[in-house]
């Protein structure tokens, strides 16, 4: 099955941030000039909705499983085990990732963390036992970058997506940091 990736479908899957504050502030200060301002569509709507988001999440998730550093052949035993023994859970993970992106982009779907933690997204608890190192996190970010390149996402949007992803590094690597403190 060949997937058709467009800028819209890629951004739908990975763009996790709303419009930058500077753009919104400028829009608020612009004179109305006798016209009513159109209400801005949510990021979810602008990016194509759940089906576009799901297609991109699917591609990215499969790429991570196949990645030699963080996937099935990882030197990290927890990652390797998850990507081999729990591979049957991947469809559910794709579903959860899709809900998460839809939720944070203003869509109608509500993401609820399966392992709530200190943050509403529960990323630290969901990843704690995987003991993901900062270098492994960076490799997943690089895989995301390769996915965005594959889909021909423009440089500015790619940078925004990667910045949004990087914002969760401390949460995702919390289990690794705790392990290092214990030794």
Q: Where are the model-predicted features located?
A:
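N-terminal secretory signal peptides and thylakoid transit peptides that target proteins
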Residues: 2-17
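C-terminal segment of classical bacterial N-terminal signal peptides
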Residues: 17-24
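Core of compact, soluble alpha-helical bundle domains
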Residues: 26-183
């Amino acid at each position: 099955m060949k997937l058709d990736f467009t800028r819209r479908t890629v951004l739908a899957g990975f763009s996790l941030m709303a419009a930058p504050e500077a753009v919104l502030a400028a829009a608020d200060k612009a004179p109305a000039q006798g016209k009513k301002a159109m209400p801005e569509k949510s990021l979810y709507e602008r990016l194509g909705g759940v089906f576009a988001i799901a297609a991109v999440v699917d591609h990215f998730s499969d790429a991570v499983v196949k990645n030699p550093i963080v996937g099935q052949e990882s030197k990290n035993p927890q990652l390797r085990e998850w990507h081999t023994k729990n591979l049957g859970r991947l469809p559910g993970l794709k579903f959860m990732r899709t809900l998460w992106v839809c939720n944070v982009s203003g869509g109608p779907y509500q993401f609820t963390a399966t392992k709530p933690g200190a943050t509403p997204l529960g990323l630290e608890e969901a990843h704690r036992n995987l003991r993901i190192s900062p270098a492994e996190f960076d490799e997943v970010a690089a895989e995301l970058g390769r996915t965005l390149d594959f889909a021909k996402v423009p440089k500015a949007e790619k940078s925004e997506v990667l910045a949004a992803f990087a914002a969760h590094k401390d949460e995702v690597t919390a289990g690794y940091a705790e392990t290092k403190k214990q030794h």
